[in-house]
């Protein structure tokens, strides 16, 4: 039950990831094969639920790629269910301050360190109580990544970084750019300056900085600055753009021209 993704972040080894939004165990297993270090199962913007997350965790399990799960919200009940089906690494969206970061951490810990309910006899996470001392070991293997996606969260970043149990901080460039007044343009110089400053600040605090960006040049720039978990693509976008390009090569250029309008997108 060792969380190798958490261990890699702690050791300072950069982890390259891919975003999963197709909500399919079949495509999740397909994408566990190319060699990405981690795969993000998105429960915030993709049509996932606990059952679909479970099937994707099962599909990814035989492969080296490590699953990270994003719940729809910083909700202890939802987090409890995701942990019980086997999630060990969570990416918690829209964390605005230290109190919300503490709430996320406490939701992943059994008492007295937190509020996670004990139901290991029913849980895939404990292999239905077949893992010896699971209740004693589980807390240390939980990896909590919190998302900062607004100017308020950026302002509160020093306090968020002080929260014990926060392993990493993920900068959400799409929502951050919108909050800064540059919706759809995360590559705006002001947004980029804020992102770069945050990456350095997070790393200096001994936490792991993370981000999603499909622009290869920017992804490499963030890695140079010290980002440790970087998602470099999204399954839905990869499929859509490849299909559009194939159609265009056979004379249908309408869909590919529409895609070209979104060159500044995170995805």
UniProtKB/Swiss-Prot annotation:
The alphabetical list of record keywords is: Aromatic hydrocarbons catabolism, Lyase, Metal-binding
Q: Name one GO biological process term.
A: 4-hydroxyphenylacetate catabolic process
UniProt keyword GTP-binding, yes or no: no
- Annotated site residue numbers, Increases basicity of active site His: 84
Under which EC number(s) is this enzyme classified? 4.1.2.52
Function according to Swiss-Prot or TrEMBL: Catalyzes the reversible retro-aldol cleavage of 4-hydroxy-2-ketoheptane-1,7-dioate (HKHD) to pyruvate and succinic semialdehyde.
Q: Keyword check for Cell division, yes or no.
A: no
Active site as annotated: 45 (proton acceptor)
* Enzyme class, UniProt record, top EC level: lyase
Reactions this protein catalyses: 4-hydroxy-2-oxoheptanedioate = succinate semialdehyde + pyruvate
Q: Which cofactor does the UniProt annotation name?
A: a divalent metal cation
In which pathway is this protein known to take part? Aromatic compound metabolism; 4-hydroxyphenylacetate degradation; pyruvate and succinate semialdehyde from 4-hydroxyphenylacetate: step 7/7
- Disulfide bridge map: none
Q: Where does a divalent metal cation bind?
A: 149, 175
Residue positions binding substrate? 147, 174-175
Q: Which family does it belong to?
A: Belongs to the HpcH/HpaI aldolase family.
GO molecular function annotations of the record: 4-hydroxy-2-ketopimelate aldolase activity; metal ion binding
Question: What is the designated name of this protein?
Answer: 4-hydroxy-2-oxo-heptane-1,7-dioate aldolase
Residues at the site labelled Transition state stabilizer? 70
- Please share the entry's free-text remark on the cofactor: Binds 1 divalent metal cation per subunit.
- Name one cellular component (GO) term: cytoplasm
**Subunit-structure text:** Homohexamer; trimer of dimers.
InterPro entries tied to this protein: Aldolase/citrate-lyase_domain, HKHD_aldolase_ent, HpaI, HpcH-HpaI_aldolase, Pyrv/PenolPyrv_kinase-like_dom, Pyrv_kinase-like_dom_sf
